[in-house]
């Protein structure tokens, strides 16, 4: 097609079912036959259509069924009888242009699997091997790819996430203590969560010893005790003392006879105090009694709320094979095309830095599994691109390009209709009206206290609109949870069984960098996204893929049915604040892409504008309708007008 649009050239006057100048070529077994129009029985039904895929790009399609009579009937019948399942034929339609030469409109193979002979007419469908049709047929198929065959030149340098290590302890319920010796307190551990060990040796079986310290990480080690204690009204001591100590750091709390109180003890051991301490390096807990003479006290531990030793640790950096989004897209398109080259995938750059600086990693690569594979489908890739970045596919011939949805709806006026139209209709598309929105990622169950810190799960908002109960789902099938990556990395080198996460796909915000060692790699991006409400803000990554950023990427589309979103719930940590904006804050939408209205009309204006991404205007009953092309179709040979459907942008007084 000419880039200036579809031009219809007429053989007769304008408003009388105009015949256009076309020629038909049937190719049978490699021989071309120019057919008279009379050989195609349904010549006046053949049409072409431009249709927008939702709020994505516009796709051109044509009539797929042809009815052959006369000479064409005989040629096709002979071909079928002679060659049976190996019969081969094509139909091509050419249309004259302004230069009085012919442009090809249709050139498709005929599908002998649909061969139907009525004795006078042979009906056959064309084989639609267009890119759009191939994708539609195979978009949900999951493919697997060896990471080694598709990985980028550089690896991802994963410098790890700070993890909180927790050792929980317990003691007995009742102690009898005297002033001469400490109570017989023996401490035992239970339900520990250790990401990186080697700092403590516990369960020693020695009175009062919580753990020996073998080392202290740079962030130090903390011990904390909180328990409800009763000093029974027995004996005549002055008071009992609960003490927690380590490497010269001590805290003590007294309790008097007959008293019940909550004892809280907290100490910290820095690496410096550990290194300089000259005696046994351990965490020690004791119960003692203060009295000037021989007596005793009975101490009851009513409830242990917390008795723990904690420290933050960070594991050694690792390198992970990474894949660019464009590479994944082209792998999928090649698979969809039967393993052949011929369909090219592109992703628009310089629109969203979050996408420009993004790489994909397979779960098996994070775990370091040999011959790691990436498991994904075209549908998952599309859903990821749309939900996280607001990017949608545009199919143009054999090129599939992902662009931001907003760029497909220009504010420039490309066509104006005033009175030159008929059969006007206006209606509301209720499918575009949403009462609530779910945005983010599927909830993951980590079985770890550190996982409570993760916030990249599903967040829900209300639009305030109650016309429908429709729910907009902006859920990415690819994962961005930092803790999910860390937990998989911790399994490296361990002989663990496979789990569901091994098939997952992750993505990270990373940029090409040079390490101090001189190695080129993808390095995690942490600057530009200030975060609070997490355990270690300085080491958190993938902050740019938070749910509010996803809403922002799709805000104009969401604006079709809402101007403000009210936070209702989150599956994860909802106390996060990013760049001084809380995840729980309401989300205000200042601009909408369009409205939920649609307009239909017919016109004898023969030119469909191109490009088709701008505004088309229409005047009806003194109102000016502005909208975007949703669909337009017209017959090729016998032109009887164009039928339009527009997505309404606005309505105003003309």
Question: What residue ranges belong to the model's regions?
Answer:
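Short beta-strand-plus-loop segments that form exposed binding edges in beta-rich domains
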Residues: 286-294
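Extracellular carbohydrate recognition
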Residues: 293-305
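Juxtamembrane "anchor/assembly" segments of surface/extracellular structural proteins
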Residues: 5-105, 109-279, 296, 325, ...
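Charged- and aromatic-enriched interaction segments used to assemble
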Residues: 136-186, 308-415
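Internal alpha-helical scaffold/solenoid segments in large eukaryotic proteins
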Residues: 284-285, 383
């Amino acid at each position: 097609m000419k880039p200036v649009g579809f031009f219809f050239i007429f053989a007769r006057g304008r408003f009388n079912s105009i015949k256009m100048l076309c020629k038909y070529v049937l190719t049978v077994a490699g021989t071309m036959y120019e057919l008279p129009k009379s050989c195609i029985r349904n010549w006046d039904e053949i049409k072409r259509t431009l249709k927008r895929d939702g709020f994505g790009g516009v796709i051109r399609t044509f009539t797929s069924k042809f009815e052959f009579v006369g000479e064409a009937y005989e040629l096709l019948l002979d071909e079928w009888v002679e060659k049976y399942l190996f019969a081969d034929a094509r139909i091509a339609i050419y249309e004259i242009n302004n230069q009085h030469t012919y442009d090809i409109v249709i050139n498709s193979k005929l599908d002998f699997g649909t061969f139907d002979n009525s004795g006078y007419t042979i009906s056959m469908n064309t084989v639609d091997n267009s890119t759009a049709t191939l994708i539609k047929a195979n978009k949900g198929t999951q493919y697997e790819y060896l990471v080694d065959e598709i990985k980028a030149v550089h690896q991802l340098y994963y410098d790890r996430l700070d993890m909180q290590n927790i050792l929980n302890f317990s003691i007995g319920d009742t102690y009898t203590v005297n002033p001469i010796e400490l109570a017989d307190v023996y401490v035992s551990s239970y339900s520990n969560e250790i990401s990186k060990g080697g700092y403590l040796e516990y369960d020693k079986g020695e009175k009062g010893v919580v753990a020996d310290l073998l080392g202290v990480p740079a962030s130090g080690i903390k011990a904390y005790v909180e328990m409800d204690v009763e000093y029974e009204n027995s004996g005549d001591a002055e008071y009992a003392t609960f003490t927690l100590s380590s490497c010269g750091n001590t805290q003590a709390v007294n309790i008097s006879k007959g008293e019940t109180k909550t004892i809280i003890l907290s100490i910290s051991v820095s690496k410096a105090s550990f290194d300089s301490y000259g005696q046994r390096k351990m965490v020690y807990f004791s119960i003692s009694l203060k009295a000037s003479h021989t007596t005793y006290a009975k101490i009851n531990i009513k409830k242990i709320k917390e008795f723990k030793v904690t420290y933050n640790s960070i594991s050694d950096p690792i390198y992970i094979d990474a894949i660019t989004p464009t590479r994944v897209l082209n792998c999928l398109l090649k698979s969809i095309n039967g393993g052949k080259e011929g369909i090219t995938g592109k992703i628009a750059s310089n629109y969203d830095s979050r996408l420009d600086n993004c790489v994909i990693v397979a779960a098996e690569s994070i775990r370091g599994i040999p011959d790691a594979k990436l498991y994904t489908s075209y549908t998952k890739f599309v859903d990821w691109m749309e939900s996280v970045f607001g990017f949608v596919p545009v199919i143009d011939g054999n090129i599939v390009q992902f662009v931001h949805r907003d760029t497909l709806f220009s504010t420039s006026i490309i066509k104006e209709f005033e009175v030159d139209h008929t059969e006007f209709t206006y209606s509301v598309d209720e499918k575009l009206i949403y009462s609530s929105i779910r945005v983010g990622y599927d909830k993951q169950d980590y079985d770890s206290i550190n996982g409570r810190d993760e916030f990249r799960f599903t967040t829900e908002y209300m639009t305030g609109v109650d016309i429908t109960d429709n729910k907009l789902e902006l859920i990415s099938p690819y994962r961005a949870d930092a803790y999910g990556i860390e937990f998989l990395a911790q399994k490296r080198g361990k002989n663990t069984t496979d789990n569901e996460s091994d098939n997952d796909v992750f993505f990270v915000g990373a940029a090409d960098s040079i390490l101090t060692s001189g190695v080129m790699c993808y390095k995690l991006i942490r600057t530009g996204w200030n975060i609070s409400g997490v355990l270690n803000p300085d080491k958190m990554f993938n902050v740019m893929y938070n749910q509010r950023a996803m809403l922002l990427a799709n805000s104009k589309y969401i604006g079709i049915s809402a101007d403000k979103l009210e936070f209702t719930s989150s599956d994860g940590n909802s106390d996060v604040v990013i760049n001084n904006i809380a995840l729980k804050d309401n989300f205000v939408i200042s601009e909408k892409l369009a409205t939920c209205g649609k307009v239909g009309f017919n016109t004898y204006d023969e030119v469909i504008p191109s490009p088709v991404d701008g505004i088309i205007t229409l005047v009806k009953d003194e109102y000016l309708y502005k909208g975007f092309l949703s669909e337009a179709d017209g017959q090729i040979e016998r032109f009887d007008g164009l039928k339009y459907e527009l997505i309404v942008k606005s309505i105003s007084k003309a």
